Each structure stands twice: as structure tokens, then as C-alpha cells.
Amino acid sequence: MTATKHKHPGVVAENRKARHDYDIEETIEAGIVLSGSEIKSVRAGRVNLRGSFARVIDDEVFLYDAHIAPYEQSGKYFNHDPMRPRKLLLHRREINRLNGLVRMKGMTLVPLKVYFKGRRAKVELGVARGKKIYDKREDIARRDAARDIDRALKRARHDL
């Protein structure tokens, strides 16, 4: 039995908080460069994306603050740094387009999930704009209203 359940098969980690804190304009799939012990930890599901972000630096995209836990079966000398910046693999035109979008005011690159496509680890990046506090409150109010409507409809169907 697996330790965590995900909606989608092959998904190792999701950054659910990102959808709460940001308005996601678009998503893009990127490969990720990992060392041997890192890929073993990713396969074990030991990834945390909370608070992580990506940046375009010198026409390359790097993922920062993504925590990939050290692989337990390897010794302390053969392990990786859990918080090191990791290079993301994208085509040149995708990098240029992302760089143009990110230079717009208030836009950032946020990793949404890490998953496997075949045997390769992939990161889904979102081009996002930060939400204001009142936007978050509005989303919560909208969800509460939808929940109340669903309850009322269920009660009405039950009474028939």
C-alpha cells in the first residue's frame, strides 16, 4: 500500500497551496535534472514543493527551494543536498516565452506538481500571479456558497 493517495497516477508531489495563493495563468511541463540519490528519493515520494519557485537565469530555468529528502539507503557521503537548485529542461522558445511572461509585473513561475511520465520525472510549472487577501476570501466564500447549494439540493432530493 502506498503512503499517500493522489488523484492522478504517477503524481509524486502536489503543491496544493500554490492554487490557493496564486492565480495560475497557464501551465507548462518541464523535465528536471536529478542525481541518482535524488531520483530514488523522488520515486519514494519524498518531495516537498511548498514554498518553491522557478527562475529564468542566463536563458536557463532553475527550481529553487524544492526539498527532496536525502535517500536513506545511501551513506552520508554519497547523498545530495536536499535544497540545492535544480535545472529544468525546456526548449529554447519555451524559455524565451516564459522569460517574457515572468518579466510582466507580478508574474512568477511556481511548480504545481512532480510526476513521472514513463520513467522520466517531470515538473508542471504554472505561470502565476499572486492573489490578494480579498481574492482568497472571495474564493472561500464562493466555495462555501457552492457547498450550501449542494446541501440544499441534496436535502430537496431526499425529501421527495
UniProtKB/Swiss-Prot annotation:
UniProt keyword Cytoplasm, yes or no: yes
Protein name per Swiss-Prot or TrEMBL: SsrA-binding protein
Gene symbol of the encoding locus: smpB
SS bond partners: none
Chain's role: Required for rescue of stalled ribosomes mediated by trans-translation. Binds to transfer-messenger RNA (tmRNA), required for stable association of tmRNA with ribosomes. tmRNA and SmpB together mimic tRNA shape, replacing the anticodon stem-loop with SmpB. tmRNA is encoded by the ssrA gene; the 2 termini fold to resemble tRNA(Ala) and it encodes a 'tag peptide', a short internal open reading frame. During trans-translation Ala-aminoacylated tmRNA acts like a tRNA, entering the A-site of stalled ribosomes, displacing the stalled mRNA.
Principal place of residence: cytoplasm
Protein family membership: Belongs to the SmpB family.
RNA-binding is among the record's keywords: yes
GO cellular component, one term: cytosol
Listed GO MF terms: RNA binding
Pfam families reported for this sequence: SmpB
Keyword annotations: Cytoplasm, RNA-binding
GO biological process, one term: trans-translation
Top-level lineage group: Bacteria
